[in-house]
Amino acid sequence: MKLLDSVRYASFEPYLSIRTTHMAVIRYLVRDVDVAMEFYTNMLGFELVEKWGPPFAMVKRDDLTLWLSGPGSSAARPLTDGSKPAPGGWNRLVLETDSLVSLMERLSQSGAHFRSEVVSGPGGKQVLIDDPSGNPIELFEPSGR
């Protein structure tokens, strides 16, 4: 048991230097940083933190910082196996809302693409939308609101 514990702690050691003061950071690959910035700031309540030329911007909402990496950013470069990172997929960020219906109406009026109908469960109700580059966002209204 002692050897197993030392292996576990030894493998954790490199992670002790990870900065923990700001852990909620997500990077999304986007087709157009300006379009993505406008969507997240005007439609979902994020604020612009920084913009580094056309290929990169950071937006923030509460404790979440979202990195928007466009074509030409280092995150969009081909990987060593030749594959090229692209927007989309199913991993997603989840944004809580007090009124899913109101937010859906606003997004629908702006032409947002909904991936799903509203799904209800014991914890609340949710719907999936796409940002302008096809990255999924889950909008979630907890039960009891």
Regions found by a protein language model. Give the residues of each.
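Conserved active-site tyrosine of GNAT-family acetyltransferases
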Residues: A36, Y40-T41, L107, G134
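Catalytic core of Fe(II)/2-oxoglutarate
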Residues: L29
